[in-house]
Amino acid sequence: MTKCRRRRLHLSNIYAFKGRKSNFQEDHSHIGGPGFSRVVYCNEPNSPAAERRNYVGNYVRSTKYTLASFIPKSLFEQFRRVANFYFLVTGVLSLTALSPYSPISALLPLTFVIAASMVKEAIEDWGRKKQDIEMNNRKVKVHDGNGIFRREGWRDLKVGNIVRVEKDEFFPADLLLLSSSYEDSICYVETMNLDGETNLKVKQGLEATSSALHEDSDFKELKAVVKCEDPNADLYTFVGTLHFEEQRLPLSITQLLLRDSKLRNTEYIYGVVVFTGHDTKVIQNSTDPPSKRSRIERKMDKIIYLMFGVVFLMSFIGSIVFGIETREDRVRNGGRTERWYLRPDNADIFFDPDRAPMAAVYHFFTAVMLYSYFIPISLYVSIEIVKVLQSLFINNDILMYYEENDKPAHARTSNLNEELGMVDTILSDKTGTLTCNSMEFIKCSIAGTAYGRGITEVERSMAMRSNGSSLVGDDLDVVVDQSGPKIKGFNFLDERVMKGNWVKQRDAAVLQKFFRLLAVCHTAIPETDEATGSVSYEAESPDEAAFVVAAREFGFEFFSRTQNGISFRELDLASGKTVERVYRLLNVLEFNSARKRMSVIVRDEDGRLLLLSKGADNVMFERLAKNGRKFEEKTREHVNEYADAGLRTLILAYREVDENEYIEFSKNFNEAKNSVTADRESLIDEITEQMERDLILLGATAVEDKLQNGVPDCIDKLAQAGIKIWVLTGDKMETAINIGFACSLLRQEMKQIIINLETPHIKALEKAGEKDAIEHASRESVVNQMEEGKALLTASSSASSHEAFALIIDGKSLTYALEDDFKKKFLDLATGCASVICCRSSPKQKALVTRLVKSGTGKTTLAIGDGANDVGMLQEADIGVGISGVEGMQAVMSSDIAIAQFRYLERLLLVHGHWCYSRISSMICYFFYKNITFGVTVFLYEAYTSFSAQPAYNDWFLSLFNVFFSSLPVIALGVFDQDVSARYCYKFPLLYQEGVQNLLFSWKRIIGWMFNGVFTALAIFFLCKESLKHQLYNPNGKTAGREILGGTMYTCVVWVVNLQMALAISYFTWLQHIVIWGSVAFWYIFLMIYGAITPSFSTDAYKVFIEALAPAPSYWLTTLFVMFFALIPFFVFKSVQMRFFPGYHQMIQWIRYEGHSNDPEFVEMVRQRSIRPTTVGFTARRAASVRRSGRFHDQLNKNFIAF
């Protein structure tokens, strides 16, 4: 590519807007009006007029807090959690005389938990702060007003500054391109940081500025004004005018260089700062993704509210009883106070028998504080710690690392780990997600002749379906075996056209035009390796790159592009030698989703004007001239065959353009592109529509987007897990169906329910152009087809058959199916089918379908995609998984979890998802179990003491229970436990349904753990009380008091809750042993150390262990007996459950324990305990065969009964 500046060249108007004197008849009404009020004084950032505008500076802050706001704002964030707020209230109440314990013992645990969360917030925010400092201190050359550019920090830039950005530097703000190192003011930009796309974009300045501003010194006298739109988040549009040298020139997105994009393949550019800081488009787009919370977390909130209700109910009951007892105290004893030790004569206390109602009210507040231990204060912070550690395991899983691209899995948020184990429906994009998005040119049709002998994966799959033998596939592999190195983007084999043999074909002239079109009709950028001389290409899409590579392999090598021309080498038909040709590039009629085609207008070396065009078959065939349809019939046949083979097709055509016609077109085209009106795009489309007509057909291309490695096996395994899989794609129905067969999403035995609008009646209405009639007929047709499909499902269900159905619907039909009146019908039909494929669906439709499934089923949905068109779907789903593939990183940046290949979804869900769900479920249940155990002992002791608000335990015993003596084991459970190993998660994928049906966190299981806690507390309290009631506790004749009873009960609680944890764990690691037995040991260590402190601090715990508990045999015997008795119910329940109604994971654990894990009969027996039959994938095919033959059915039933 030419690097020097070229002067006095005739500049074309290819990509941008030709600088010209203003036509004041144009509509400039937007500029200066609402939404278009920005005025930029170029080269005068400090002028009074500019200062009055008061635009924001270029300093960017992404931090959540400032130094001044951190403490108040982070405290507010912490106390928004209802549990934290509750503990704050109880902490404040502890400062009053109502408190049953010392204030410091109440406030210290809360302070610890809040401080831990705030430290986490501070660390995360400091990371953002460091990024801000690094970015704001970057340097760029800024014009000082005297023709000299000096390096300044990004943070100091102002609107109106002129900057010089050099190769491989980032743009510091949104800049208006004035000129570049190229004479015609083009530059190449990489927008990876904006939209994730790695291909280069072409930008071009106005001719007026590029011809006047060449060197640094040219900017000394620059005076210009930009009037444009106000700051907004739209990355793809920009409207404004430049007032320069008495001209008013229209501006578009082509002249705008966006902050954080990078200058590539261009030595330097000059630009004027238009938007700064938080006004730039990239920052305007930096909104937080939608906040997502897992179902378990939302249910946990409900449990917290339930516990609040229990606490207040207990406090209310205790207060009523206390009030009655206080009033009856004197009545029963003839006016004498029986409980004299409560000192009712003391005005500072609240137990006056003469004021019993007030005593009850005061007691209520005391009880609320005393029973606060029912609420697990460390639950939230423990779960956050566990989820972060779980995310680290996901991120560092070597089995989800894609070495080829150096891409590991990345959990971008840890909030949804357990949700990965509850997915009911997967909604997947196709291109780049199920397929590689690495296009290979494999076949083509030229002049009605089909070329290319390659066999696609879909054709191989179709052959296997038809013949039912893997030998067919083996034979096909031999056919496509090729010698020589693999060429990226090219997998074509046909000796008739390779190595220059195309010149010997009957239609060599047509073949030459076809290959020339591939070499010229594109926007690819060539890059030549100076060492080897080989040419590689930067293209806007993998398809386009494949076309250019194919042209090169056919002997038409595109090797250079300038703003005005395209250069390529080809084999000359006349001389038989390779020659270089240069076509002058006049216009590029760019592709968009509405046009479904792109064209270029070029002038060849003979001076002829040519329109070269490629596009979708449905828009290209209708634009053919009468004399251009010579090969149409054969080409249509070949296109249909290619679609059946799962290939992506484009039609190639051309025509010669009359000189006068082009002059008129160029005039109208330039006026349309230079207009500053809201309908600019429609004007351009209207003009190009007139040019892209009367085309002469050359042929069609067929490129294969191969399935990613492991996709069929992954889909098969997910289907065995009972997960439904929907595919939402923009491809044609035929292509999507055949890809569905190739990846086993569809199978031969399935009945296909196809909904489309290809009926003769609707086609006739379309030809007549009756819009209202078309809409009415289309809506009616879609509804009728849905009702017919539902009737098929109902009939199959009533017949108790094993038929599986697949729903396939196109984008037009989907528009009507998603209407409010019919979407429930559509959802009922779709959820009754084993597979759903939505074809020709738009990004908006993908998001709407995802929303419908999520809200309509109430189950967890996962969306997976790789492109910008999948962002809405990813954000709408409960979990968004981004594929870090070829289409850039925009999907990844909008996702919750990123993986490199679809096949990693199997391990992410079946292993990590199941483990995280199982761990978090057990962890939360255990948290409430241990707190109920501890809290009920406090309640029982208070009831035993006539609700006198006397705590059963020392203040510090109360405070440290949740923090030091019981939290670490439960955190270890949440991080390390495995109910079954990864191997068995794969072997028995139906285990995953435990999460889908939420069996491990059902209300039945939660309530069961709560009752277990209540029983444990009852056993501990009454056994300890009765064991110590009438005994002499030491040689001096002293009986057990509160400190001894409390110490014994506390010891039993610590032992029992930790032993219960040990019994609940399925997979022990050395770390779990350390934290469980270490927590118990730490209790004894703490008791000795705390008891050795002065009595003024340790109060009744002073030497209680050394002098009272440890020497007494009854203490140790009671502890041992209570532990045994309190854990018996759990043993009994587990034994009965394992014997009579085992969970799925328990069945797997048992056959592994019995040594039957490798016995095919036992393995198949467990699989037969399906919660949901497998209806897609290879396994479904085998299962269908088994059902038809009835093999092993009776034997499996016998085996299960015996088991």
From Swiss-Prot:
Protein EC: 7.6.2.1
Extracellular side: 94-97, 326-363, 942-955, 1029-1041, 1092-1108
Residues annotated as the enzyme's active site: D429
Entries under Pfam families matching the protein: Cation_ATPase, PhoLip_ATPase_C, PhoLip_ATPase_N
Positions contributing to Mg(2+) binding: D866, D870
Keyword Magnesium in annotation: yes
GO cellular component: membrane
Keyword Glycoprotein (UniProt): no
Record GO biological process: phospholipid transport; protein localization involved in auxin polar transport
Signal peptide: none
Catalysed reaction equations from the record: ATP + H2O + phospholipidSide 1 = ADP + phosphate + phospholipidSide 2
InterPro entries registered for this protein in UniProt: ATPase_P-typ_cyto_dom_N, ATPase_P-typ_P_site, ATPase_P-typ_TM_dom_sf, ATPase_P-typ_transduc_dom_A_sf, HAD-like_sf, HAD_sf, P-type_ATPase_IV, P-type_ATPase_N
Membrane-spanning segments: 72-93, 98-120, 304-325, 364-381, 922-941, 956-975, 1006-1028, 1042-1064, 1071-1091, 1109-1133
Compartments, as annotated in UniProt: Membrane
GO MF: ATP binding; ATP hydrolysis activity; ATPase-coupled intramembrane lipid transporter activity; magnesium ion binding
Membrane topology, record value: Multi-pass membrane protein
Superkingdom of origin: Eukaryota
Segments on the Cytoplasmic face: 1-71, 121-303, 382-921, 976-1005, 1065-1070, 1134-1203
Predominant location: membrane
Assigned keywords, A-Z: ATP-binding, Magnesium, Membrane, Metal-binding, Nucleotide-binding, Translocase, Transmembrane, Transmembrane helix
Summary of the function given for this chain in its UniProt record: Involved in transport of phospholipids.
Annotated family: Belongs to the cation transport ATPase (P-type) (TC 3.A.3) family. Type IV subfamily.
UniProt-recorded name of the protein: Probable phospholipid-transporting ATPase 11
Organism: Arabidopsis thaliana (Mouse-ear cress)
Lineage of the species this protein comes from: Eukaryota, Viridiplantae, Streptophyta, Embryophyta, Tracheophyta
